[in-house]
Regions:
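A general alpha-helix detector
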Residues: 9-10, 47-48, 86
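Conserved beta-strand edge residues that scaffold enzyme active sites
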Residues: 45, 82-83, 124
Length: 135
């Protein structure tokens, strides 16, 4: 199985008081047990570290950042300028949705790598046609 990991999943995994923390842990363990091939982007990592720092402080953000940048479980995609342009097309196409540009980069990467499934708690992935994992 190939799966894209979104900011929302990482933030929930590192924020132990989040309503979905236990659900996220179950999904994460299931992905590891299945030896899933996991992808994310530099944009997602940057956004995650920013949000974790705001919610849980510098030390947790430092641990999170180290985990993500150094993970042997993640394929860290560095989007090209061509993929950034495709992301911009996603952004324009879905003007009626409240998409972040980071989400659009994720969609462009998923589309380019033919990944249909995301580990996310963000409804926007389903709104544009991708699937999200359930526990």
């Amino acid at each position: 199985m190939r799966c894209f990991l979104d900011t929302s999943a990482f933030v929930v995994l590192y924020h132990k008081n989040d309503t979905y923390h236990e659900t996220a842990k179950k999904i994460w363990l299931k992905l590891k047990e299945q030896d899933a091939v996991l992808y994310t982007t530099r944009d997602v990592v940057v956004e995650t570290v920013i949000l974790v720092r705001r919610r849980d402080g510098f030390q947790t953000a430092l641990i999170c950042g180290n985990d993500l940048w150094e993970s042997s479980l993640l394929e860290l995609v560095q989007p090209s300028s061509q993929l950034d342009r495709k992301a911009w097309d996603w952004f324009k196409k879905y003007a009626d949705k409240e998409l972040s540009f980071v989400d659009c980069v994720s969609f462009a990467v998923m589309n380019d790598l033919r990944i249909q499934t995301a580990f996310t708690f963000d409804k926007n992935f389903k709104q544009v046609g991708f699937e999200s994992l359930e526990p």
